[in-house]
Amino acid sequence: MARIAGVNIPDHKHAVISLTYVYGIGRTKAKQICSAAGVAESTKIGDLSEEQVDTIRNEVAKFTVEGDLRREVSMNIKRLMDLGCYRGLRHRRNLPVRGQRSKTNARTRKGPRKPIKR
C-alpha cells in the first residue's frame, strides 16, 4: 500500500479512485493530480513506480488536505460561533445552517426526538 498524505492508499484500485481516500480530494482534484503527475487515471496504484508515487505525493502536497483541512473547517465554524452571527448560532444549537425547515424535519441534525415531560 502506498502512503500519501498520511493515508494508506489501496493498491488494487485505479489512481483516481484511490486518491479519493485522502480527505479533501474528490474525483475532480484526483483527475487534476493524475494529469499533473503524468499518470493515466486508469493505472492501478500498485503498478506505479516509486518515482510516479513521489510525483503524486508532491502534487497532493500542493493542496490543503487531511488534518490541515479538518482544522481549517473547524476553525471556520468556531469563528462563526464566536462572532454570534446567525450561522454561528445555528451551529451552536445543532440546527440546520443553510435555511432548511426545522419545525417538522431536520431530525439528522437535531438528533432523536426528546419526549415531552408532563
From Swiss-Prot:
Residues 93-118 are annotated as: Disordered. Coiled coil: none annotated. The keyword Transmembrane does not apply. Pfam families: Ribosomal_S13 (PF00416). One of its GO terms (molecular function) is rRNA binding. GO terms for cellular component: cytosol; small ribosomal subunit. It comes from the Bacteria. Disulfide bonds: none annotated. One of its GO terms (biological process) is translation. Keywords: Ribonucleoprotein, Ribosomal protein, RNA-binding, rRNA-binding, tRNA-binding. Belongs to the universal ribosomal protein uS13 family. Part of the 30S ribosomal subunit. Forms a loose heterodimer with protein S19. Forms two bridges to the 50S subunit in the 70S ribosome. PANTHER family: 30S RIBOSOMAL PROTEIN S13/40S RIBOSOMAL PROTEIN S18, SMALL RIBOSOMAL SUBUNIT PROTEIN US13M. Located at the top of the head of the 30S subunit, it contacts several helices of the 16S rRNA. In the 70S ribosome it contacts the 23S rRNA (bridge B1a) and protein L5 of the 50S subunit (bridge B1b), connecting the 2 subunits; these bridges are implicated in subunit movement. Contacts the tRNAs in the A and P-sites. This is Small ribosomal subunit protein uS13. It comes from Saccharophagus degradans (strain 2-40 / ATCC 43961 / DSM 17024). The gene is rpsM.
